[in-house]
């Protein structure tokens, strides 16, 4: 029997979502937990699949996975307690054997969290120009044979809790590094280094390329599919671990800034300037 899961994970702790030999990955830990629980005997038997791969450092809030197991009730009841604290399942649904997360997802959305304040209104102006069907090769790392045309259904920038911009974008599918490329262009615009209409230039030029923003700010935010999920029991340790990490990261940020003895925002801006000099007017 095949099961689909809504799941989340803390990307900073993994080399990526897909299995890589001798590296800690989301797939590797998920399959290891299933083997420990007795859901299947090995990775081949598990048939682990996702709605979209994520790179090293990229987190997920609601990602779509699937596995094959003859013990669906056991998986729903106990799998979370055999996973590490930085991976968790929110809900599960029984699906037919032809189900494939990649094709079942009608829409995927991402959020990118920027580290410092920028002009949100300029960024929103630029983000709105991404909506529609375009050739997004200028924002992506292209793979041979991949169609560069995608349809973005939603793109907006708003101010987060800390006053820093947050970029949210949705589409049926994305190219590799496409969202990070968009985020990179938007932060350049938000800092006033180029105008919002540079987006049209990137969409219309077959040779233009933008440097992607760092992976650590990116979250696979949500997936829309025609499934009804049964909620799964959660480990208290997951939220406790995330809260502990958040506190440690905040303290580490303040410590690093104190040791720097200069304005870290200025260093960040200089890095953006170096990476996006080709876009400046």
Curated annotation (Swiss-Prot):
Entry's EC annotation: 5.4.99.12
Catalytic activity of the protein: uridine(38/39/40) in tRNA = pseudouridine(38/39/40) in tRNA
UniProt keyword terms in alphabetical order: Isomerase, tRNA processing
Highest taxon listed in the record's lineage: Archaea
Residues bound to substrate: 110
GO biological process, one term: tRNA pseudouridine synthesis
InterPro entries hit by this protein: PsdUridine_synth_cat_dom_sf (IPR020103), PsdUridine_synth_TruA (IPR001406), PsdUridine_synth_TruA_a/b_dom (IPR020097), PsdUridine_synth_TruA_C (IPR020095), TruA/RsuA/RluB/E/F_N (IPR020094)
Record field: transmembrane: none
Recorded family membership: Belongs to the tRNA pseudouridine synthase TruA family.
PANTHER family registered for this protein in UniProt: PSEUDOURIDYLATE SYNTHASE (PTHR11142), TRNA PSEUDOURIDINE SYNTHASE-LIKE 1 (PTHR11142:SF0)
UniProt xrefs under NCBIfam families: hisT_truA (TIGR00071)
Record function comment: Formation of pseudouridine at positions 38, 39 and 40 in the anticodon stem and loop of transfer RNAs.
Protein's name according to its UniProt entry: tRNA pseudouridine synthase A
Organism annotation: Methanocorpusculum labreanum (strain ATCC 43576 / DSM 4855 / Z)
């Amino acid at each position: 029997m095949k099961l689909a899961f809504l799941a989340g994970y803390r990307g900073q702790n993994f080399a990526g979502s897909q299995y890589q030999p001798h590296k800690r990955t989301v797939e590797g830990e998920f399959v290891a937990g299933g083997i420990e629980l007795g859901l299947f005997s090995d990775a081949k038997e598990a048939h682990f699949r996702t709605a979209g791969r994520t790179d090293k450092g990229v987190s997920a809030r609601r990602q779509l996975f699937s596995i094959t197991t003859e013990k669906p009730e056991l998986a729903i009841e106990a799998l979370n307690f055999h996973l590490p604290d930085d991976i968790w399942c929110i809900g599960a649904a029984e699906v037919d054997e032809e189900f494939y997360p990649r094709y079942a997802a009608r829409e995927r959305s991402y959020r990118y969290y920027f580290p410092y304040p920028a002009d949100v209104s300029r960024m929103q102006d630029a983000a709105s120009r991404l909506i529609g069907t375009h050739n997004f090769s200028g924002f992506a790392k292209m793979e041979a044979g991949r169609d560069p045309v995608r349809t973005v259904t939603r793109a907006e920038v708003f101010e987060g809790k800390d006053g820093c911009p947050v970029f949210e974008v949705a589409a049926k599918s994305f190219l590799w590094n496409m969202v990070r490329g968009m985020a990179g262009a938007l932060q350049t615009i938000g800092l006033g280094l180029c105008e919002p209409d540079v987006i049209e230039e990137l969409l219309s030029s077959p040779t233009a390329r933008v440097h992607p923003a760092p992976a650590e700010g990116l979250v696979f935010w949500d997936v829309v599919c025609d499934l009804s999920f049964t909620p799964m029991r959660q480990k208290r340790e997951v939220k406790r671990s995330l809260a502990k990490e958040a506190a440690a990261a905040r303290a580490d940020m303040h410590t690093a800034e104190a040791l720097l003895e200069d304005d870290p925002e200025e260093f960040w801006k200089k890095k953006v300037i170096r990476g996006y000099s080709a876009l400046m007017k």
